[in-house]
């Protein structure tokens, strides 16, 4: 699970590897101590998310996108079958957001990923199905999200903007 806002004290002296290792707590009988397999798994997950060169960097020295990747590595290091992400890009710029969704798309080849997001237009380029919840549940293949679906979910005063097409702001 990756929460929308992880409560991490930026002054706490912990490295990227330390954070990923925390995901191994409870997966072995070595309570409080990490073995060689734990360290190997943490290194592997940092490689998977493209942060192997930053493994010894303090968490406080990482960008928002790098921190999100560390937290994803922490969630993955316990080898889950399901990854649940709550607004994983809420504080990221567009470029880092795309990078993160590209990573999730790659990871989705191996495990089920559920993403909670309010940005249906952007997210729909990366997912297989969209489930909208607003007093009712709407399940749609990605290609079927149109203005009728959006109006049914959010009311008449919402405009749909497609991120993959040019649009006027006027």
Task: Describe every region a protein language model picked out.
Residues 128-143:
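H-loop (His-switch) and adjacent beta-strand-loop-beta switch element
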Residues 21, 36-54:
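Conserved ABC ATPase "signature" region
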Residues 79:
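Conserved catalytic motifs of ABC-family nucleotide-binding domains
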Residues 83-87:
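Catalytic Walker B motif of ABC-type/P-loop ATPase nucleotide-binding domains
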Residues 145-170:
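ABC ATPase nucleotide-binding domains
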Residues 58-62, 66:
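Conserved ABC ATPase signature
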Residues 103-115, 119:
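Conserved catalytic loops of ABC-family nucleotide-binding domains
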């Amino acid at each position: 699970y990756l929460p929308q806002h992880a409560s991490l004290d930026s002054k706490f002296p912990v490295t990227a590897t330390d954070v990923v290792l925390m995901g191994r707590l409870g997966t072995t009988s070595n309570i409080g101590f990490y073995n060689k397999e734990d360290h190997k798994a943490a290194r592997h997950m940092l490689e998977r998310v493209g942060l192997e060169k930053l493994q010894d960097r303090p968490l406080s020295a990482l960008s928002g996108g790098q921190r999100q990747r560390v937290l994803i590595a922490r969630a993955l290091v316990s080898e889950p079958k399901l990854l649940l992400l709550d607004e994983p890009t809420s504080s990221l710029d567009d470029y880092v957001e795309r990078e993160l969704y590209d990573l999730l798309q790659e990871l989705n080849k191996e495990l089920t990923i559920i993403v909670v997001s309010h940005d249906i237009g952007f997210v729909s380029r990366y997912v297989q199905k969209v489930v909208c919840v607003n007093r009712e549940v709407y399940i749609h293949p990605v290609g079927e999200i149109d203005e009728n679906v959006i109006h049914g979910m959010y009311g008449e005063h919402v405009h749909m903007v497609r991120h993959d097409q040019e649009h006027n702001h006027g």
